[in-house]
UniProtKB/Swiss-Prot annotation:
The record's note on its domains: The N-terminal domain interacts with the head of the 30S subunit; the C-terminal domain interacts with the body and contacts protein S4. The interaction surface between S4 and S5 is involved in control of translational fidelity.
Role played: With S4 and S12 plays an important role in translational accuracy.
GO CC, any one term: small ribosomal subunit
Record-linked Pfam families: Ribosomal_S5 (PF00333), Ribosomal_S5_C (PF03719)
Species of provenance: Rickettsia felis (strain ATCC VR-1525 / URRWXCal2)
Encoding gene, per UniProt annotation: rpsE
Subunit text: Part of the 30S ribosomal subunit. Contacts proteins S4 and S8.
PANTHER family xrefs: MITOCHONDRIAL RIBOSOMAL PROTEIN S5
Name used for this protein in its record: Small ribosomal subunit protein uS5
GO molecular function: rRNA binding; structural constituent of ribosome
Keyword terms of this UniProt record: Ribonucleoprotein, Ribosomal protein, RNA-binding, rRNA-binding
Annotated family: Belongs to the universal ribosomal protein uS5 family.
InterPro entries listed in its UniProt record: Ribosomal_Su5_D2-typ_SF, Ribosomal_uS5, Ribosomal_uS5_bac-type, Ribosomal_uS5_C, Ribosomal_uS5_N, Ribosomal_uS5_N_CS, Ribsml_uS5_D2-typ_fold_subgr
Keyword Mitochondrion: no
Organism ancestry: Bacteria, Pseudomonadati, Pseudomonadota, Alphaproteobacteria, Rickettsiales
Entry-linked NCBIfam families: rpsE_bact
Amino acid sequence: MSKVKKNEETLSEVLVDVNRVTKVVKGGRRFAFSAYVVVGDKAGRVGAGHGKAKEVNEARGKAKQAAKKRMMKVPLYQNRTIHHDVVGKSGAAKVILRRAKAGTGVIAGGSMRAIFDSLGVHDIVAKSIGSTNVYAMISATFDALNKLASPKSIAMRRDKKVNEISVKSSDIQVNE
């Protein structure tokens, strides 16, 4: 994950999960709230964070600060979709992210949709397999987003030009 400087005014915030948690002590039960927040600038930067406090608003604020610390830059194709299909895993959760043509929209469920909206993705197809736990789904989605690479970065890594690694499907010859 690459660290990115944050600009407070342009970040959108989505509250993904709020949960009341209990700590049992000698004198009884102590209640608190945990919150999970996704923040993004709708231009290729996104982060997620978790916070816990006695009040919901405090927990949300802590989660937002944690999310801003964990923001990452994601390479987008034409500022609307991802460059290539990718799979991410976290525990029993598995997500498959597929690029989509213009006009397709965001086809994703729950917490994944919050990430893509905050990221600024307009066309993507996402499928979740296995666990549907919010924390696992977000972690698996971030794992997949970490695996994304632009053709330019792949070309630099291989010491080649972009047109040498980008191949059209019509250029592939199949020997039968």
